[in-house]
């Protein structure tokens, strides 16, 4: 698998858990049940019959992309209730050194190559410790290189998992109503804000709630999106796009934004 993201996007934990994306490590497909939640991921990864380096690569790739911080508050406490070998590897690293490594590569504009496992792993741990560091592109690139370093890959389903829409070439498939997509996506965005740092969380949650309220108001005023005039549809798309601007660093925020742009271009 190529190491660059291009127009790819590292799948969210929700997409992986629903089987809308598939991760392989050392050529071994990872069951979708492994990704039931970010919090239980280490325990489930620990059950795989592959070496610890590959397990840790898969674990940290999802944690990095999800902006999960295993060193913080309740996450740290819960982790030590069942501190398996993967967690021990992560918690025994020199976190200060990892944070410095992450800063170096953030300043350079890209993560270490997959071949440089030591620096790549340090960079990933630094990003876990500094939850608000790095934009989505940098984190997704880091996540992809971690999986590549483990001799694996991540393949997304043809369906756009977060939206229910389809890719080019699937025009015969009935498109899911925008209302259902928005309802599901706004719920996921609000859930994702709960995993953000204390500093980032209030602003992101405010934007997510504004998006939800905007959707409710427009739905009550205009009826089904599919029945609206072109001008009304444009008004909806503009309103949603504006609400999403402050949360484009969230996986689900970016996914919904791309979907809204796609709808607006039709």
From Swiss-Prot:
GO CC terms in record: virion component
Segments of skewed composition (Acidic residues): 167-177
Keywords: Virion
Record's subcellular location: Virion
Domain of life of the source: Viruses
Record carries keyword Lyase: no
Span list, region Disordered: 158-177
Its job: May play a role in virion budding and release by binding the ribonucleocapsid and the host membrane.
Official protein name in the record: Probable matrix protein
Organism whose genome encodes this protein: Quaranfil virus (isolate QrfV/Tick/Afghanistan/EG_T_377/1968) (QRFV)
């Amino acid at each position: 698998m190529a190491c660059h993201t291009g127009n790819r996007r590292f799948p969210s934990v929700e997409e992986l858990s629903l089987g809308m994306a598939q991760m392989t490590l050392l050529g071994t497909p990872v069951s979708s049940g492994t990704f039931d939640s970010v919090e239980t991921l280490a325990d489930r990864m620990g059950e795989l019959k592959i070496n610890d380096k590959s397990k840790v690569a898969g674990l940290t790739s999802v944690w990095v992309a999800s902006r999960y911080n295993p060193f913080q508050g309740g996450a740290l406490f819960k982790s030590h209730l069942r501190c398996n070998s993967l967690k021990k590897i992560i918690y025994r690293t020199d976190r200060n050194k990892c944070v410095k490594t992450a800063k170096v590569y953030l300043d350079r504009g890209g993560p270490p190559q997959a071949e440089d496992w030591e620096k790549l792993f340090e960079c990933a741990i630094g990003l876990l410790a500094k939850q608000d560091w790095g934009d989505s592109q940098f984190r997704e690139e880091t996540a992809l290189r971690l999986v590549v370093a483990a001799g694996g890959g991540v393949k997304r389903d043809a369906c756009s998992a977060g939206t229910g829409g389809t890719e080019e070439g699937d025009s015969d498939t009935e498109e899911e109503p925008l209302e259902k997509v928005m309802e599901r996506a706004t719920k996921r965005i609000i859930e994702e804000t709960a995993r953000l740092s204390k500093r980032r969380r209030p602003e992101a949650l405010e934007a997510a709630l504004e998006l939800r309220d905007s959707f409710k108001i427009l739905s009550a005023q205009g009826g089904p999106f599919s029945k609206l005039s072109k001008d009304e549809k444009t008004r909806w798309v503009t309103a949603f796009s504006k609400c999403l601007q402050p949360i484009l660093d969230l996986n689900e925020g970016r996914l919904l934004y791309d979907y809204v742009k796609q709808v607006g271009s039709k």
